Amino acid sequence: MPTTFKEIPRERPVTPLLDRADTPHGLRRLGEAELETLADELRLELLYSVGQTGGHFGAGLGVIELTIALHYVFDTPDDRLVWDVGHQAYPHKILTGRRARMSTLRQKEGVAAFPRRSESEYDTFGVGHSSTSISAALGMAIASRLQGSERKSIAVIGDGALTAGMAFEALNHAPEVAADMLVILNDNDMSISRNVGGLSNYLAKILSSRTYSSMREGSKKVLSRLPGAWEIARRTEEYAKGMLVPGTLFEELGWNYIGPIDGHDLPTLIATLRNMRDLKGPQFLHVVTKKGKGFAPAEVDPIGYHAITKLEPLNAPAAQKKISAPKYSGVFGQWICDMADADARLVGITPAMKEGSDLVAFSERFPERYFDVAIAEQHAVTLAAGMACEGSKPVVAIYSTFLQRGYDQLIHDVAVQNLDVLFAIDRAGLVGEDGPTHAGSFDLSYLRCIPGMLVMTPSDENELRKLLSTGYLHTGPAAVRYPRGTGPNAVIEASLDPLEIGKGVVRRQGQGVAILAFGVQLAEALVVAEKLDATVIDMRFVKPLDEALVSEAAANHELLVTLEENAVMGGAGAAVSEFLARANILKSVLHLGLPDVYVEHAKPAQMLTECGLDAQGIEAAINERLALIG
């Protein structure tokens, strides 16, 4: 097995067993003695395929044996297998007929980064966001029972995803309806229990066996006739299990808890899954795996190797280093440290996005003012509200797509009370290869309808810093949305002074057409404006809108064009049209933004072209409208 990136194969490895097991039907024709070798081949294939395309890396390496065991024991796709989030689903995709297409992973019209129902019958539920698997599998189990089917429903969820309240809502509900389902906890950093070994594996086999289950039920019938005897027996059993297993919480919720067992021990996995397959009621299996298993760098640094970029051929010439602009997240990371130095009231909150939101430096410099709440967006927002009530100044660093999960709290707990909370909304707009589940397509639409909300869209790195200060120093809730990646390399001023709220700025004076740019599409607007001699306005604020500037543009131009990387429906352009209607200003308005579809995964530039938001598409749309209005 490779131990360095140089050793990862650049050509498809020889995998005779995997060649025979590229579907679960082929897998089940293999003998159990061959599965260990198959695991080695699948791990090598995963290293090769992700090296060709880039993608999520460590999680898949950690579930090789579990994936094989699940498809070997259960009758997929008839039995429903639901993967939480989907980062770990690449081995599943390879084993379910998509091996030949893995070279298209995360590319336009290629294999998706996450399980998709439209992609394969083995992808029984589309995922991307965390902690949905148990609810989905429970719904499938209930529906199957109502239909008279005996198919099995299995949810595989990681220990990180189990921090979200939604997962526990489902865990609480399933025993109430006596659902025949299996939840597998993939504990890949041993955060819940370290109690793994031969004795624990042996106990799991016994406790999951049909013989033990029958004996337990028989004893219950006999002892229940003797006053107090069954209660004593039950407590003795719990005490004996409690010395070896950490499942008291799940048992109290009504689950039959088995484990923890070694998630890389194929014989134990297969034996335990076979036993649990035949048990009735809600079953819970705790397996412990190692993220990045089999590839030393990923085992040592599972966070750093959560995902990797495409590997270049070994003989490729060294690429010249480019002087790159700072990432927008990096600008935020520097700003929050600077503002924290200036204001001791500042606290930073994130739902498990420290690295992605660039809060590492802040967490190290201000550990007592940094709060990572794990995958708990609802809690993050209301936690910020509580802090604001007591005079702190919370900054919630969150991805646009994940803020959707805390929307009620944003309205009910923050906005209704007009609390001073700044939302630094990263990954706004299209995000590229991760596709529609991770796109920030809707934040302008769902934020601008909230009374009292300050909503801002910077056009470059310097404006981001200024608008963050503006939102932070504002009284009431505020949001600054910014995209993934880098900007145009603007000169960033050190000042923490705010901008005047609700005021845009004219970046280019032209005639005939006025382009009202909301956000980073300003750069494309300026390119188009040079060809059309158009006026370009950097609007900066979606709410409050610079109504005076819009009125002036309407009075002096034949056509107004609104430009945003947000859904056209309800977005910034809609705010412009709503104002014009209220002011009784009749003007032709062209709205350019994201169409009313889910934009599929591709490179960001390809997605913008598809949506008509590159310079060529913007120019074509404007010319088409000008032709219509004569």
Curated annotation (Swiss-Prot):
Pathway: Metabolic intermediate biosynthesis; 1-deoxy-D-xylulose 5-phosphate biosynthesis; 1-deoxy-D-xylulose 5-phosphate from D-glyceraldehyde 3-phosphate and pyruvate: step 1/1. One of its GO terms (biological process) is 1-deoxy-D-xylulose 5-phosphate biosynthetic process. One of its GO terms (cellular component) is cytosol. Disulfide bonds: none annotated. CDD domains: TPP_DXS, TPP_PYR_DXS_TK_like. Binds 1 Mg(2+) ion per subunit. Binds 1 thiamine pyrophosphate per subunit. Belongs to the transketolase family. DXPS subfamily. HAMAP family: DXP_synth. Homodimer. This is 1-deoxy-D-xylulose-5-phosphate synthase. It comes from Pseudomonas syringae pv. syringae (strain B728a).
